[in-house]
Amino acid sequence: MAFIAKSFYDLSAISLDGEKVDFNTFRGRAVLIENVASLUGTTTRDFTQLNELQCRFPRRLVVLGFPCNQFGHQENCQNEEILNSLKYVRPGGGYQPTFTLVQKCEVNGQNEHPVFAYLKDKLPYPHDDPFSLMTDPKLIIWSPVRRSDVAWNFEKFLIGPEVEPFRRYSRTFPTINIEPDIKRLLKVAI
């Protein structure tokens, strides 16, 4: 089991361009974390909606995408290939993320990234689908398997500006529909 940080601000990740992303710099802002994949059926929808949310709250929201290949091998690009895959394949059309993508990682199992160990400890299941599980056991490629595991690509975690993990959303919950919760956390009029 991965070490579980005491505070969200103790965590960090490495961006696709190799820079350390220190979560301590996010104080006072809401943070949306989503495990992403460039070859999933909802890649275009979710990446486009992540850009929309980042553009709507440019100074008060941090969006972080964590590429992961644990679900149907749908992020089989190397770190240095991910941006080109997004730009030319899916979503394509010159797409460029307006948010930070970090290096590929595992979100479940023995080698899960510390960010996901922390988030799954604080938010053990999606609020919109508390019974969500991986639907096909043949696709489970990690061990150990836990009830709190991320079930598929594009699960989302929203952390409030006061550092409290606020809510976890299933893969079927449209990313853009998180906006009212972001406004609530940021105390912006709806």
Curated annotation (Swiss-Prot):
GO terms for biological process: response to oxidative stress. Keywords: Cytoplasm, Oxidoreductase, Peroxidase, Selenocysteine. It comes from the Eukaryota. The active site is at U40. It is an enzyme of class 1 (oxidoreductase). It is found in: Cytoplasm, Cytosol. Exclusively expressed in the stomach and small intestine. This is Glutathione peroxidase 2.
